[in-house]
Amino acid sequence: MNKKTRIAITGPIGRMGRMLIKEIQNNKHSHLTVAVVQKKHQLIGQDIGRIIGIGEIGVLISDELNIKKNDFDVLIDFTRPAGTLEYLKYCNKFKKNIVIGTTGFSKEEIDIIKSYSQKIAIIIASNFSIGINLLFQLIKKTTQIIGKDSDINILEYHHRNKIDAPSGTALEIGEVISKVMNWNLNQDSIYYQKGITGIRDAKKIGFSIVRAGNIVGKHTVMFSSYDEEIKITHTASNRMSFARGAIQSALWIHKKNTGLFDMTDVLSL
């Protein structure tokens, strides 16, 4: 009988953390063993299951200083860049693999993550839903066929509390398009603002961003020519698709030794 993969979660009290824990407990191949919060958090020592409303599960909330080597097999982290880099240090120290769903990293921070992947296995993705990763493939194919004849725009919508813009997923869509078109995303992007903007440059990707209400996530890519327009849209109804993808990633990476991976590796796309 195969042992369950023991998973540690950072930010367990947040919306994503709660969803992850519920899905971990429902997955027959995984179970939660560590729920990590910041130092001196008022809920340290309490049962995380009771706190998130699923009843006691025997896992007490702890801070990062209490992570022990034998507590977990894989860490799932959806926090902020500075926190992720600290958790990477722990994983590297204890030779534990990590799944990173945090977005908003700088180029320098990405380079740090890449350096850690020489010592442990890391999965990093802007979006863990299977649907959005299929969308990446559709965008790639569409760009190959009509990209040179289209104005391309990315529209992304998220809840009012999201602090980074554009979203990591929108930027990844932009990278998919840029690679096909041989563009530089940083140089070949348009962020729409008020005022006289001038005629639209054909060889750039337009970004439009909405932050409102409780929108989980919606991404639309428009390919517009003089004769027709194609829209490809993915809408997340809730965060469960992200949670399932992250846990699938944790199970996949458990036995890996080193390397930097993404959802195309997990899904064999």
Curated annotation (Swiss-Prot):
Annotated (S)-2,3,4,5-tetrahydrodipicolinate binding lies at H159, G168, T169
- Documented EC number(s): 1.17.1.8
* GO BP field: diaminopimelate biosynthetic process; lysine biosynthetic process via diaminopimelate
The record's annotation in Pfam families points to: DapB_C, DapB_N
GO CC, sorted alphabetically, is: cytosol
Specify whether Oxidoreductase is a keyword of the entry: yes
* Main location (coarse class): cytoplasm
Quaternary structure, per UniProt, is:
Homotetramer.
Q: What does this protein do?
A: Catalyzes the conversion of 4-hydroxy-tetrahydrodipicolinate (HTPA) to tetrahydrodipicolinate.
Pathway listed for it is: Amino-acid biosynthesis; L-lysine biosynthesis via DAP pathway; (S)-tetrahydrodipicolinate from L-aspartate: step 4/4
Question: Which family, according to the similarity comment?
Answer: Belongs to the DapB family.
For NADP(+), which residues are the binding ones?
A: K39
MF annotations from Gene Ontology: 4-hydroxy-tetrahydrodipicolinate reductase; NAD binding; NADP binding; oxidoreductase activity, acting on CH or CH2 groups, NAD or NADP as acceptor
Catalyzed reaction equations? (S)-2,3,4,5-tetrahydrodipicolinate + NAD(+) + H2O = (2S,4S)-4-hydroxy-2,3,4,5-tetrahydrodipicolinate + NADH + H(+); (S)-2,3,4,5-tetrahydrodipicolinate + NADP(+) + H2O = (2S,4S)-4-hydroxy-2,3,4,5-tetrahydrodipicolinate + NADPH + H(+)
Binding residues for NAD(+), per the UniProt record?
Answer: G11, P12, I13, G14, R15, M16, G101, T102, T103, A125, S126, N127, F128
Q: Where in the cell is it found?
A: Cytoplasm
What's the name of the protein?
A: 4-hydroxy-tetrahydrodipicolinate reductase
**Catalytic residue positions:** H158, K162
Record keywords: Amino-acid biosynthesis included? yes
Alphabetized UniProt keyword annotations:
Amino-acid biosynthesis, Cytoplasm, Diaminopimelate biosynthesis, Lysine biosynthesis, NAD, NADP, Oxidoreductase
Q: Which organism is it from?
A: Buchnera aphidicola subsp. Acyrthosiphon pisum (strain APS)
